Amino acid sequence: MPGNSLGKMFRITTFGESHGPMIGVIVDGVPAGLYISKEDIEFELSFRRPGKQFVSGRREKDEPEIVSGVYNGRTTGAPLTIIIRNNDVISSLYEEVKHKPRPGHADLPYIMKYGYENWDYRGGGRSSARETASRVAASAIAKKLLMLTDTVIGAHLKSLGPVELDEDVSFREIFCSKYSPVRASKKWLEEKYEELIKQATVEGDSWGGVAEVIADNVPIGLGEPVFDKLKSDLAKALLSIPAVVGFEYGLGFKASKMKGSEANDEIVIKDNGKLGWRYNKAGGILGGLSNGEKLVLRCAFKPTSSIRKPQKTVDLRTSEESTIRVIGRHDPAVAIRGVSVAEAMVALVLVDHALRSGYIPPVKLSEDQARIIEEKWRRYVEECKPMQESQ
């Protein structure tokens, strides 16, 4: 099964299944000398961890173990391997799924491609969103390296079902939404999201949503024309997330309904004396290259496919139509935890391109660089907590 790797100079390869003994990721291309700890990785994992209110009841601790590529707390330049053991597995909940593929899931396509006898039906196997914990673990390394370019990434749930944020929101509010149980950037929005989720849970149904990711201080010129454009790699990374059904940046699909005079952004001299764009309608990307403005992109998540409502399917034992009610532990809105995954994927793409463009040394960090990264990382971990508590 190829297709488990992403990136060129900063390359990740994930492995493992939802109900296997572990999942994990191999990260190749990490410069030597970076301080990295279990706690750094746990910090990022904590925001997508299941078992919280409004998400899956599967209670995984998500404790990462660094098993290669680090010595005395610093990267060696060798491939860095992280494993996360699966501890809260109840495969018996999926016995019916073994014979009745779930509507909206990858079950039937996997059976058709790899064969029924080779299909790991337990929790979705390799197609499960459980795999994304490995990506988030790798993103901790990516985000630390991006401290060298002062790039900071924030993400929030812009809409859930029929409820959508229709007012301006600051980058700070977006950044701090990671402390909201539903990844809302406004308190009123959080309350409306929670109402929707409670309603869906009672009805045995689910909701879809849209995650918005903002990256500030993105270096100019990231992207390699023509097939490795920044937008192309971001689209690939975000569309690889389970349940993501759409991607846009800047004006996105709205631009298709505009005139050129409306969609074009005026070039101006900014307050700092540098050239820039008046409104950032392009979302930080023009010609497939980052242009120095904030990176603004969105990805749409479909509703969680595993729902308790009866749905039509086929019993593979009898080849007759049947029904199924999925009784496992599932998110009423996969988009909530998907926000953290979308943020992680953007970090992975940006660090890969930053290495390719020479903004980050590819072989070894200097002592000053390693120290600066560590200092900025500590501020990143601590800085938004007081603001969140005051909201």
Curated annotation (Swiss-Prot):
Going by the record, the broad EC class of this enzyme is lyase
Q: Which SUPFAM superfamilies match?
A: Chorismate synthase, AroC
Task: Reply yes or no: does the keyword Amino-acid biosynthesis apply.
Answer: yes
According to its UniProt entry, the protein's GO biological process terms are: amino acid biosynthetic process; aromatic amino acid family biosynthetic process; chorismate biosynthetic process
Q: Which cofactor does it need?
A: FMNH2
Q: What is this protein called?
A: Chorismate synthase
What PANTHER family does its record include?
A: CHORISMATE SYNTHASE (PTHR21085:SF0)
Q: Which organism is this entry from?
A: Sulfolobus acidocaldarius (strain ATCC 33909 / DSM 639 / JCM 8929 / NBRC 15157 / NCIMB 11770)
What is written in the cofactor note of this entry? Reduced FMN (FMNH(2)).
The UniProt keyword set, sorted, is: Amino-acid biosynthesis, Aromatic amino acid biosynthesis, FAD, Flavoprotein, FMN, Lyase, NADP
Task: Enumerate the residues binding FMN.
Answer: 126-128, 287, 302-306, 329
The pathway is: Metabolic intermediate biosynthesis; chorismate biosynthesis; chorismate from D-erythrose 4-phosphate and phosphoenolpyruvate: step 7/7
Documented EC number(s): 4.2.3.5
MF annotations from Gene Ontology: chorismate synthase activity; FMN binding
Q: Residues that bind NADP(+), according to the entry?
A: 48
- So what does this thing catalyse? 5-O-(1-carboxyvinyl)-3-phosphoshikimate = chorismate + phosphate
Q: Which HAMAP family match?
A: Chorismate_synth
Provide a GO CC annotation, any one. cytosol
Specify the superkingdom: Archaea
**Family statement:** Belongs to the chorismate synthase family.
